[in-house]
Amino acid sequence: MWRIGIDEAGYGPNFGPLVMSAVACQAPSELVEADFWEVLHPAVGRCARRGGHLFVDDSKKVYQPGKGLAGLERTVHAFLSCLSHPGCHTLADLLQCLQTQTSVGPMIDEPWYHGGTTVPAAAAAADIASGSQNLKDALAQAAVCWGPIYSIAIDTPRFNGIVDRHGSKGAALAVAVVQLLRACLAHAPADDGLVIIDKHGGRNFYAPILQELCPDAWVVPIQEGMTSVYEVRWPQRVIRVILRPEADATSFEVALASIVSKYIRELCMEEFNAFWKTHVPHVKATAGYPGDATRFLADIRPTLERMKLPMDRIWRKR
């Protein structure tokens, strides 16, 4: 059976991309609802545990501004090593490796993006190699096959276009979820599965979205509300889909998806800040969140106007 987790990074900021990722693994049926923090221990663990394991947890616990990307990076690159992707040496490589077949080239309209940032950027190669080998050993012992991993980076112009068409920034989440689920289901066309999605925004009813995604299946609502549960039924298989807030606290795959998304977004924000530092040397870097984003916009506005960059190319409308 397949276990799939989906989570995002960057839903709230005014600057930078919204990144959403899906991670999947194929596990024996007796492990479909198992606690993978225990199944894969000691190779992986939460941040509260001591030791040299890979951190898989809420990305806000793994990454703290000012402390660098090493924690995120060790985990992401160790899990990528379990896949058949070619080596990723730059941000552009990473985005290319993880994009779905239907996703548009990432950040093509962002003035600050060049994709040349070297990865890994902070973690030592020896630490990644050690974590990777321990992970592969744990996966083999549990008979778990890891992958695929997909990510979608919705740049500011595309984000604003979605808001204009649908009147809600929550629509951007729906667009990304549909693309990611379509890619994951295509990868596993004949197997049952469990999909857990970290829920954001006020939407409680997802049956129409799932039915549009799977027109040849029967979508059955099991529960709709703060937590929404559906079964997507085909004659040969059933996929159970659960959407709930703070799913990264209880789902290993969702926590890992949050880490992948956060890692990509932080690499993007490094390029964002470097671009504006080149044009406005005195400007202090921003994470892009409301409040500080307003300060940053005020600092760069004169340069923005001289460059004749439209506001909706760098500033999200919602």
Task: Please provide the spans of the model-predicted regions.
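RNase H-like, Mg2+-dependent phosphodiesterase core
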Residues: 1-318
